[in-house]
């Protein structure tokens, strides 16, 4: 998979989780990305943001030592940049 394929799959997962309150992050990467995604779309999509944050929180309740700073998530390459995450996820959430 290319970096764009990985990014696209992660955005699709964020979009799906944002619309379904019962989801939980599957791993550390998802939990940290969901947390960031929740923060960057909160003003435009408060309901979806809440779903993402809850999915992240459920994972971190079982794995509290796996929470990373925003800078570390970007450094690891899980997110290219916060503005890019916001723009691309907002587009997916808007057009569904």
Predicted features, each with a name:
Residues 7, 18, 41-42, 80:
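N-terminal non-cleavable signal-anchor helices
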Residues 10, 34-38, 49-53, 82:
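Generic L/I/V-rich hydrophobic alpha-helical segments across diverse proteins
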Residues 27, 31, 37, 55-56, ...:
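Small side chains
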